[in-house]
From Swiss-Prot:
Residues 413-758 form the Peptidase A1 domain. It is found in: Golgi apparatus membrane. The active site is at residues 431, 682. This is Aspartic protease 5. The gene is ASP5. One of its GO terms (biological process) is proteolysis. It comes from Toxoplasma gondii.
Amino acid sequence: MEAGAMGGSSFLSFSSGPSAETSPSSLSPPTSSSPSPSPQLVSDSVESLHAKRPLAQSSRSSSRTAASTCFCWQGEGQENEAAPTISQEERRGGSMTAASAGHLETAREEAARCLGCSYTGEERRGASSATSVLSLGGERGRPPSRSSSLWTFSGLLSPLAFRSRRCCPQFSSSSSPLSPLPHPRGAPASACGSAVITDRAGRPASPLSFSRLASPVSDPSGVCPPRVVAARVWRLLSSVLFSLVNCARLFPRRLSRRPDPLRKPRAQVWSASSRSLQALLLATVALFAACSSLHGSSLLGAQAASPTPPFLSLSSSPRSLASDSAKKGSNAPEQSREQRGEREGERQRPDKGEENGETEETFPAASGVVPAPGLKVADLPRTGPPVDLLGLPIRKKVFRARLYGSMFSYAYYFLDILVGTPPQRASVILDTGSSLLAFPCAGCSECGQHLDPAMDTSRSATGEWIDCKEQERCFGSCSGGTPLGGLGGGGVSSMRRCMYTQTYSEGSAIRGIYFSDVVALGEVEQKNPPVRYDFVGCHTQETNLFVTQKAAGIFGISFPKGHRQPTLLDVMFGHTNLVDKKMFSVCISEDGGLLTVGGYEPTLLVAPPESESTPATEALRPVAGESASRRISEKTSPHHAALLTWTSIISHSTYRVPLSGMEVEGLVLGSGVDDFGNTMVDSGTDLSSIFPPIKVSFGDEKNSQVWWWPEGYLYRRTGGYFCDGLDDNKVSASVLGLSFFKNKQVLFDREQDRVGFAAAKCPSFFLDQRPRGPDSGDGPKGRPTAPFTVPPLRVPVPMDGGGVPGDAKQPEGLPLSPQQLWVAAALVVVAILIAVTVILLHTIKRPSRSSAVVPAPSAPRLPFAQNSKSAGRFARGLGHGALGVGNPVYVQRTQRYREVQEAQPHTADAYYDVEEDRFTGEDDGDFFGDDSVPSAEEQETAPSLSLREESSPFSASQSTLLDLPLGGE
């Protein structure tokens, strides 16, 4: 609270009393009322068709058993024409007329058309291996083909799954490893076109249990959740891999041949690579199957526990199926009716605890939010909107910031702000009695030690000092030079800067220089957008409590100073793309609280009771740790007299309200009656029976009243004692400070110039829960946070008159979501498998038709002197590019030359010609003209080399040394 602004009226302030700071301290899908389809009804058609197989075979020449009805699902609520079926009498008798036979053929063609296939009759089928049976029982009397078993195994209609030209596999057979399951009503159609095969009861039948388990539950809005999308991706990949593996099974002769030495190298490479590819595919299938089961178990765990599929609903099914289910509901077994009655009874039965007057908590315990008393579970949705890091519902254009501190340990409440680029954190005290935002900077010799290091202005790429010549931004005095370092490499002493001086009612004072930079409320993880603010204060001097306090600076949220210098909140209110309402709220608890900019928190309010009554000192009041059931029964408590009380603001210098008086049990304070003073009580005494509530009245046209409970004006001290927060400030004006704000949500409406009060259950935040700043070494230990990844958005102040870029997106805290991490992991696994396959294919060597060559030495080297003539001849052969280090010819010839050199040492009159692969006894002199000639002693000591000796194993007459061409083929 600023000093020297006292008047006859009272005003609200966050300044405390004279006490100094001491040691710190799945959307549930709608359930259908109809009974769930019984597996007995689904298999009834199959058993009946199998039982009539002898009759159908006896009359094969004239007729065949009819196929089941096929419903084409083209859209929601559209009923399509069903294929004509055979009457029950004709089925039971086993005989049909010519007309019935014609209807049967038409039925099959209609069903085939629904499936998007071309039906072929018995006479046109020929010797095709693929069946075209459309009934559930497999009426052809032929064992299922490979294509049908492949479809049953893969669950995906893939072109690789069929060997014949016909596209309709057998959906179910007696030898199928997977029995058909009832297809859920309202679910998407099966894979074969847009149709499903139904049983006798009219229920669609699914060919796979896997397809039912993988069927996702769609959102009512039509948007699938991310986990459902991930499950669909896993199902698709698994199905494709299953199809590829079974496709390899269709061609065992081509892919399983053993290596043949007479075959060409390319065929051998293809055979080996195909076997390696099969092994890799099997390993990949196992991996994807494990991932699918793991992901599907978490998605469908709740569905498996329920006897009724959660997506069975008449409203979501096609009209034909819905009407059919309604008509045939009377034919359901009695057991299903009983189960349906139990489920309806459970839905109509009140929740456990409501019978006893209790309600359950609707917010998670870890969120720090307690449901407001007076609200029942039926009044609030069980599945609320998504919450943010503070456990509150996410709202657009609303900024939130944690408040830390307490009345006893700190005597103030503070929040964190991020300043500069890259951001640096500063802790600032929330003050409704001033309008200055300031904190110490690096180089301040008269500043104390605080929670965070002093801001280094030279590190900020977006900061700039405010010059005295800038009259539109400088409203203070001018400095003639300070010891602070400059922004952008310059010192502030080189020019005259805009300066500020601020004093407070408890005797503290600060002095510093203004600068402009970007500022964001809260921690980095909250991702509140930063804004450009031209009036950030940089301390050069601190006195009294500012030196010893833990918080670094001050954050004033009062009205602008002199109606010219806007506060940080005024800058945010000036742009509609940031906030919708010019309103902020403060909710303070025993330890910590919450600051909300752009609105208030309705979920934290305490709802009023059904009936209001006069105040009673015996009434119970909600305190910390009290159950919700006890709070709900408080129907006579004056704490719930009004949900929200508004009073007008009569002055814009501070938040001044027309306070008319305070009354305690009929006694008006300030009329000669002694106040409570610093009374101490025992912690075990019932406060509600000793200390009465205080009724605070405001002198506006509505005669607004707010109740001030002992939990607010009493605060805990050490040793189990309490002290009251009432004190005489020795001036004529009254101050409603922290003790009045406690356990209330105070709303400051700047548009309508009013202040609102409402009882609330404010969240608590302790200092050990405070995250670390952008620098890993800043602040106490806690959860690390990431700095800004992009430069902050520059938002001009209202006086600039410039436009504001809209739709600015803030950097995300995590680069990828959990669903994206799953997809990235799958892609990494696939990339590794592809790399292993390529390596295996490249490691397969092509065999040569010639005999084996001598292995290359580990470190091949020239067996002669560097400047000798043999070296010249050897280098000449290599220079033509015919021979290389990895060439077998080069390796073989080098090995032979070394063997000759070991037998007879190399001399000057013997040379090796690499191109001709032979030794010569004389020097042509056409390679190195400056070669040194060996001395006479060396010529005498060196033995002569004769290539024509019969005893030499490497004679020049041996033609085998010259048979190999240079290419090695």
